[in-house]
Amino acid sequence: MLIIAGLGNPGSKYAGNRHNIGFLAVDAIHRRHSFSPWSKKFKAAIAEGELGGEKVLLIKPQTYMNLSGEAVGEAMRFYKLQPADLVAIYDELDLPAGKARLKTGGGHGGHNGIKSLDAHCGKEYRRLRLGIGHPGVKEMVQNHVLGDFAKADNAWLEPLLDTLADNADMLVRNEDSQLMNKIALALGGKADEEKPRKDSEKKPAGQSHIRQARNNNQPKLPATGPMADMLKKMFGNKGE
């Protein structure tokens, strides 16, 4: 069983906030697949269903962001799940709007919802961070995070949520890099490029393969004999 927890704040006042992109992501998955209607349990809104043949619980904590771990932790204890059975989806200030990153474990990065999850659920769960961009100055962060998405944001927000919902079964199959590539391509970016070769495999710095070939195949000139005498007459000795 896998729990997919979207983080956010409950109530209509916060529904369109950037801080609630985790709720929006889980709602998109719920709409796209055959999940039960939302119900209340574990201090949260929950819905049950299947993705990729595995049972999945969608959860939106109703405790407010700072106490998200209370709800998710209660659900994990009820189902006897481990941190590896949890995916948390939440907003990330330090990623450009529309970018996504998915990894296991790590720090909370100042995110209070993740601080709470770390305390109640352990740290080795998968974290899907969805970029909302940074306003540029620290003083504007709170208004930015708790502000609603602008209409212009739909240009990246809709394809991001649609692609995540369409490919949510990849979360079940642990196809994390493939999912990130699909999201990047949907947003007009590039898939992850091939990793650079190891130093031992690289060509010598500053030399093309042609130059290397020349260096390795230079002919040896005769030092004595008639040919050497002729070359000396034509070109002279080096250093003269």
From Swiss-Prot:
Gene3D superfamilies: Peptidyl-tRNA hydrolase. Transmembrane segments: none annotated. Keywords: Cytoplasm, Hydrolase, RNA-binding, tRNA-binding. The keyword Thylakoid does not apply. PROSITE patterns: PEPT_TRNA_HYDROL_1 (PS01195), PEPT_TRNA_HYDROL_2 (PS01196). One of its GO terms (cellular component) is cytoplasm. Residues 190-204 have a biased composition (Basic and acidic residues). GO terms for biological process: protein quality control for misfolded or incompletely synthesized proteins; rescue of stalled ribosome. Residues 209-219 have a biased composition (Polar residues). The record marks N9 as: Discriminates between blocked and unblocked aminoacyl-tRNA. Signal peptide: none annotated. Its EC number is 3.1.1.29. The record marks D91 as: Stabilizes the basic form of H active site to accept a proton. InterPro entries: Pept_tRNA_hydro, Pept_tRNA_hydro_CS, Pept_tRNA_hydro_sf. Pfam families: Pept_tRNA_hydro. Residues 190-240 are annotated as: Disordered. It is found in: Cytoplasm. GO terms for molecular function: peptidyl-tRNA hydrolase activity; tRNA binding. The active site is at H19 (proton acceptor). TRNA binds at Y14, Y64, N66, N112. HAMAP family: Pept_tRNA_hydro_bact (MF_00083). Belongs to the PTH family. Monomer. This is Peptidyl-tRNA hydrolase.
